[in-house]
Amino acid sequence: MEKKNQFKTITEGSIEFIAPENFSIRGPGTKTAGFYNMDQKLNRDITISFLKTAKPRIALDAFGGTGIRGLRINREAGIKTVISEINKKSYEYINMNRELNNSNIEIYNKTFQAILNDYLFDYIDIDPYGSVLPYIDDAMVNIRNRGYIGVTATDLTALTGSMPTKTFRRYGAFIINDVYRHESGIRLLIGEIVKRAAAMDKAAIPIISLWHSHYYRIIFQIVSSSHKADAQLKHIGTFDRHSGFSQEYKSSLEGPLWLGNLNSEIAERLDYIENPDKHFLETMERIKTNDLSRYFADIADYARITVQDTKSMESSMEKLRDHGIICGRAQFSDTGIKVSSSLSDAFHIIY
């Protein structure tokens, strides 16, 4: 174990814990012992809010790191929690943090697959380094019926189409790498997980979908039902900018990807964490607009393709509301607006 002067004490939520002095503060970080990413606090805050609302009986934090996620789930959501961590040094960090917080979480120095042989979980949290695809099948096999799986994906180069051959090799799809890429990327990941669940006669239903910084975060409910699996598959298809956005956009097919809702009604009634910060509250307001429209009206991009000056967000939303259109800021772009009308109507009202 490292010397004490190499530790840093951090407080997140209700938990005080230790992490390596050189822990990752921002960005995707590196795969190291005792890995802690401050940039994923929002991810954990939203997860805790969801779990306080859904109240599963037993949760698995499958890639423990410092143990911060599992410790917070146990204390703040009041759920029996198991943490698995294959890295021996990280496992020692988690044990130290359990003692520091006088917690009753269970910790195992085992692989993700091995821990699934010992328990049947109501909630499984998958936050690996990179893609979630190597782990999602095992999770869906070992989750209770109507249980939940939370996934954090950081392979955004593949999901956003910035490396087209990798996107096709990994997901069998084409994604346009432009201002709409993060909604496309989330829809691509949802579609892939829906298809994998359906192959097991299960329905994967997205509950909350988030893009932040270097990662996507999606929480699914998994329901054992071939009928519901078939219904979910009907929401997978291709999307054309020309017919889906406005005639000013060239015809260009993306997909196959998820064309259904990004959230369920649970996202509207989350039991928020105690003392939520401004970032959490602003993000939740944007998440709640996810399903006003499929994609969003990006006012800067529309101005670019029509060679006009960009309108302000405030004046654009005021015009839309004057026409009786419900609207809100999109989480996927700072110049994007989710609307209750067609995107074409929204663009033509604004411009």
What would you call each of these model-derived segments?
Residues 1-351:
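SAM-dependent transferase fold signal centered on methyltransferase-like domains
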